[in-house]
């Protein structure tokens, strides 16, 4: 087997409201898939990359649902473990909003994914991939998953694979802020490409500017840092270059969940395609913009054709403004 990239983490069944209002007011829900790492896997698969996702799911119907949905997206799940214990597949409820941030309630404590151990690491499978994508969520789920994350990143790094890391800061999952900051920054030192949001970077480093945040992680060993600035765009820096890329025009923000995953899809795919860091970040901005205009966690993740059409439309807008 040959994979372009592989990732791991917890995917959950998502039940998202069909009506506006608080979760306590809603009567009907639709079912979907949620999970930062699986979002990225699906996004890269839609762009034609051979993707693998590894995890543990419950021996239940929601676990079956997750596997079948990922297979539909073209993501390889051949090494996902079905739990033989009573640990269930995680799930979440998400409200429907007219725009902005929805209310999300998670049910993931003691989930099957949180029990994944280093003894269950399929090294041969991961070594089939040239790139590893990691987020800061798995090490927050349990001591076992924290050890698993360190083990995988060290093994892939020692094998000469490239590693991208999105901190995906979730304070509610960690025992305390100090542990969160230390662990995420420690793991960032094992990555080649690091993708924090500006608020995450400020929290993790104490720096107040994109330049300061980027310098912090370049000194820790990253070769490329891309900092998400929301609707303003993104800033990137390497050892020899830096730049600011304006955000893409968005007609209406429907749901912000998954925007950061879309950015990661764009940047990773761009680098794997051989684009410059600047052009890869611009692609990240574009896919992030597409994602916030769609209701689901990955509904806006495009095919190559849709991405090309969106980028062409963005260039046309800029040309009319005289920006080029």
From Swiss-Prot:
Its EC number is 2.7.1.45. It comes from the Bacteria. InterPro entries: Carb_kinase_PfkB-like, Carboh/pur_kinase_PfkB_CS, PfkB_dom, Ribokinase-like. Pathway: Carbohydrate acid metabolism; 2-dehydro-3-deoxy-D-gluconate degradation; D-glyceraldehyde 3-phosphate and pyruvate from 2-dehydro-3-deoxy-D-gluconate: step 1/2. It catalyses: 2-dehydro-3-deoxy-D-gluconate + ATP = 2-dehydro-3-deoxy-6-phospho-D-gluconate + ADP + H(+). PROSITE patterns: PFKB_KINASES_2. Induction: Induced by galacturonate and negatively regulated by the KdgR repressor. Is subject to catabolite repression by glucose involving the ccpA gene. GO terms for molecular function: 2-dehydro-3-deoxygluconokinase activity; ATP binding. Substrate binds at residues 35-39, 106-108, 170, 261, 297. Keywords: ATP-binding, Carbohydrate metabolism, Kinase, Nucleotide-binding, Transferase. ATP binds at residues 168-170, 228-233, 258-261. Catalyzes the phosphorylation of 2-keto-3-deoxygluconate (KDG) to produce 2-keto-3-deoxy-6-phosphogluconate (KDPG). Belongs to the carbohydrate kinase PfkB family. This is 2-dehydro-3-deoxygluconokinase. It comes from Bacillus subtilis (strain 168).
């Amino acid at each position: 087997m040959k994979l372009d990239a592989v990732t791991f983490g917890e995917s959950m069944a998502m039940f998202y409201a069909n009506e506006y209002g608080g979760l306590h007011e809603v009567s009907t829900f639709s079912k979907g898939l949620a999970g930062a790492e699986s979002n990225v896997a699906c996004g890269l698969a839609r762009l034609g990359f051979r993707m693998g996702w590894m995890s543990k799911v419950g021996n239940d119907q929601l676990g079956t649902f997750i596997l079948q949905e990922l297979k539909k997206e073209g993501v390889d799940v051949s090494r996902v473990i079905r739990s033989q214990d009573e640990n269930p597949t995680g799930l979440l409820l998400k409200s429907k909003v007219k725009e902005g941030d929805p209310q999300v309630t998670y049910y993931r404590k003691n989930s099957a994914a949180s029990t994944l151990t280093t003894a269950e690491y399929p090294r041969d499978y991961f070594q089939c991939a040239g790139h590893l994508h990691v987020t800061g969520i798995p090490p927050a789920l349990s001591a076992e998953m924290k050890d698993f994350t360190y083990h995988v990143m060290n093994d892939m790094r020692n094998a000469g694979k490239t590693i991208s890391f999105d901190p995906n800061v979730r304070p509610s999952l960690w025992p305390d802020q100090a542990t969160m900051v230390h662990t995420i920054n420690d793991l960032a030192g094992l990555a080649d490409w690091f993708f924090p949001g500006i608020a995450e970077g400020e929290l993790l480093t104490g720096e107040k500017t994109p330049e300061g945040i980027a310098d912090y992680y370049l000194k820790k060993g990253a070769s490329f840092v891309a900092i998400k600035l929301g609707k303003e765009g993104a800033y990137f820096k390497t050892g020899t270059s830096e730049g600011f890329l304006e955000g893409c025009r968005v007609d209406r923000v429907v749901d912000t969940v998954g925007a950061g995953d879309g950015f990661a899809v764009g940047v990773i795919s761009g680098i794997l395609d051989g684009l410059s860091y600047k052009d890869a970040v611009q692609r990240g901005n574009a896919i992030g913009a597409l994602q916030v205009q769609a209701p689901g966690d990955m509904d806006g993740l495009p095919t190559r054709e849709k991405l090309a059409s969106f980028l062409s439309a963005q260039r046309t807008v800029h040309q009319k403004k005289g920006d080029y």
